[in-house]
């Protein structure tokens, strides 16, 4: 093949992004309706923040996270057990030549946001933010630009 499936820079193609979004919607609807009878999934709200497709559209990597981030490995194992059922349901909802094989992974964004929150609440960062607030108050800037009229006369 002379053409690459990826755009320059390793970015996914528009088709890959479009199919990934269709699969994400179908998967989140399936997990919301709770058609899966598994004790590990009962009463859990599972979010599907991202799906990434392979260039040939035959593999969908579904990133999931249970609400609250609890029992992630248990939820991933339960979804893997019902992979065949979920693949069949996706095939019915998304019209593709081949139903993509489904792989489940924990969403790394949840862990990343936790690290950012911990960093922002650290004593050093709080101290720096307090210093910035004091400097703004001392300089008379409230952080918002002054309103001026069209002639710049304050009205």
From Swiss-Prot:
It is found in: Cytoplasm. Gene3D superfamilies: 3.30.300.20. Keywords: Cytoplasm, Ribosome biogenesis. GO terms for biological process: maturation of SSU-rRNA. One of its GO terms (molecular function) is ribosomal small subunit binding. Its main location: cytoplasm. GO terms for cellular component: cytosol. It comes from the Bacteria. SUPFAM superfamilies: Ribosome-binding factor A, RbfA. One of several proteins that assist in the late maturation steps of the functional core of the 30S ribosomal subunit. Associates with free 30S ribosomal subunits (but not with 30S subunits that are part of 70S ribosomes or polysomes). Required for efficient processing of 16S rRNA. May interact with the 5'-terminal helix region of 16S rRNA. Monomer. Binds 30S ribosomal subunits, but not 50S ribosomal subunits or 70S ribosomes. Belongs to the RbfA family. NCBIfam families: PRK00521.2-5, rbfA. HAMAP family: RbfA. This is Ribosome-binding factor A. It comes from Methylocella silvestris (strain DSM 15510 / CIP 108128 / LMG 27833 / NCIMB 13906 / BL2). The lineage of its organism: Bacteria, Pseudomonadati, Pseudomonadota, Alphaproteobacteria, Hyphomicrobiales. The gene is rbfA.
